[in-house]
Curated annotation (Swiss-Prot):
Species in which this protein is naturally found: Methanococcus maripaludis (strain C5 / ATCC BAA-1333)
Gene, per the UniProt record: argH
Protein name: Argininosuccinate lyase
Gene Ontology molecular functions: argininosuccinate lyase activity
Organism lineage: Archaea, Methanobacteriati, Methanobacteriota, Methanomada group, Methanococci
Pathway: Amino-acid biosynthesis; L-arginine biosynthesis; L-arginine from L-ornithine and carbamoyl phosphate: step 3/3
Catalysed reaction, written as an equation: 2-(N(omega)-L-arginino)succinate = fumarate + L-arginine
Gene3D superfamilies, per the entry: Fumarase/aspartase (C-terminal domain), Fumarase/aspartase (Central domain), Fumarase/aspartase (N-terminal domain)
NCBIfam families xrefs: argH (TIGR00838)
Length: 481
């Protein structure tokens, strides 16, 4: 029986109501965090002389036993509502209510669950960052391998300008690097303690909130008690980061699907990330990229669901907040799985250099550089040069001739001239790439510089990550030793 019901409500409760309202199914995500929270709170109660040292030692010793045995060994009775009451009931069963019943002094499940969520989520955020750093390292290796691999870039999925495949990979690395930065920023706002806020108005007991903050490795306090129990903005912020990263990863999946098709044929996805057809024996389908793309799309829905649950809730705690958790954890695991899939596909992709080069050499991808050359060499306005090259492309298509065959005629008509050497250079796609050596450009030496810069950032991120992992591992070790 739920020990909370024996007073105000009585013991009668409908079974379907219990099953409908329990959170035990997804409380496994906060089990360890709840134990850590209980130990920290109990330690502080002893230090503040709120409970006796003898009772505190008994409670903490039993909590450590529960942690060691694991959640699966507990009586997960849905009538107990949640993992907090399951653990407290287990303590009472082993120690008696006069001892175990003192653990919850000065605390509510409201500040308890808010603390647990922050403890668990900070660990998951570091796990996400770990996978992202691994993926970025692997992508940087691919970029470095192909810093001189000529290909064509697209706008509107129409061939645009020559680039290198290494530069194309760097475009995704650049976006993901910002995602890593966002997760680190969010971590600092997750890692704040609401413990001690009580139900919503703190407590009359002489608690030391800064002590539990220290014991649990939080960077600071959520000071206002009403905000402390009601705020889930740290979850929304994390899920927004997840959704943004999911969008960035979905673009990679889309490129894997499109560019591996026979029509493009510039890359080939490794066999282990593909499947075949049940009827068409020739097929090699990019199933993993497609499924990953679809799963990443669900992240937006999870975020909107959480925002909708939170919208216009009365201030402080409402049980609606319980329904946020499953959407959070589903998003986290979907993202982690997806990162690993994208990492695997990019790391093992085969590049068709000849096809990439062929695409870069046709469909007028060098037209922009030809216009730029007219500006530099002939001193005309870019808009005029744009019009002249546009006319060249139009005639080339209509007359089915190469630009080289008609350029002298068109230039002469416009009282302009250009040496054959300048024309050849302007129309050479790799020369186009080499010329674009400004910061962020596709020139091989600039790609190499960018790779070095990203490697330095990744090293700094890894150092920061290792420090944070060590901090939370130290908390666990100190509380459970």
């Amino acid at each position: 029986m739920n020990i909370l019901r024996r007073g105000r409500l009585g013991s009668n409760v409908k079974e379907d109501v219990m099953k409908f309202t329990t959170s035990l199914e997804f409380d496994k995500e906060i089990f360890e965090s709840d134990i850590l929270c209980d130990i920290a709170h109990t330690t502080m109660l002893v230090e503040q002389n709120v409970i006796s040292e003898e009772n505190g030692k008994k409670i903490i010793a039993e909590l450590k036993k529960i942690a060691e045995k694991g959640m699966e060994t507990l009586d997960l009775d849905p009538s107990l509502d949640d993992i907090h009451m399951v653990i407290e009931s287990e303590l009472i069963k082993e120690l008696g209510e006069d001892v175990a019943g003192r653990m919850h002094t000065g605390r509510s499940r409201n500040d308890e669950v808010a603390t647990d969520l922050r403890l668990s989520l900070r660990k998951k955020v570091l796990e996400i960052i770990t996978h992202l750093i691994t993926m970025e390292k692997n992508m940087l290796a691919v970029s470095n391998e192909h810093k001189e691999t000529l290909t064509v870039g697209y706008t509107h999925l129409q061939q645009a300008q020559p680039v290198t495949f290494g530069h194309q990979i760097l475009s995704h690395i650049s976006a993901i690097e910002r995602d890593i930065s966002r997760f680190f920023d969010t971590y600092n706002r997750i890692n704040l303690s609401p413990l001690g806020c009580g139900a919503m108005a703190t407590t009359g007991f002489n608690l030391n909130r800064k002590r539990t903050q220290e014991l649990l490795g939080f960077y600071g306090l959520i000071e206002n008690s009403m905000d402390g129990v009601s705020s889930r903005d740290f979850i929304v912020e994390t899920m927004a980061n997840i959704s943004m990263l999911g969008t960035n990863l979905s673009k990679i999946c889309e490129e894997l699907v499109v560019f591996s098709s026979a029509e493009f044929n510039t890359i080939e996805i490794a066999n282990e990330y593909t499947s075949t057809s049940s009827i068409m024996p020739q097929k090699k389908n990019p199933d993993v990229a497609e499924i990953t793309r679809a799963k990443l799309s669900t992240l937006n829905g999870e975020l909107v669901t959480v925002l909708t649950i939170m919208k216009a809730l009365p201030n402080t705690y409402n049980r609606d907040l319980q329904e946020i958790s499953p959407h959070l954890w589903k998003s986290v695991y979907t993202l982690i799985d997806s990162i690993q899939m994208v990492d695997g596909m990019i790391s093992t992709v085969k590049v068709n250099k000849e096809r990439m080069k062929e695409n870069a050499e046709k469909n007028y991808s060098t037209a922009t550089e030809l216009a730029d050359t007219l500006v530099r060499e002939c001193g005309i306005a870019f808009r005029m040069a744009h019009g002249i090259v546009g006319e060249l492309v139009k005639r080339s298509i209509e007359e089915k001739v190469e630009i080289k065959e008609i350029i002298s005629e068109v230039l002469e008509k416009n009282n302009l001239s250009l040496s054959q050497e300048k024309i050849d250079t302007a129309l050479d796609p790799f020369e186009n790439v080499k010329l674009r050596n400004v910061i962020g450009g596709p020139a091989p030496e600039e790609v190499e510089r960018a790779i070095s810069s990203f490697n330095e950032k990744i090293s700094a991120y890894k150092e920061n990550l290792d420090e944070k992992i060590a901090e939370i591992e130290s908390v666990k070790e100190n509380l459970l030793k």
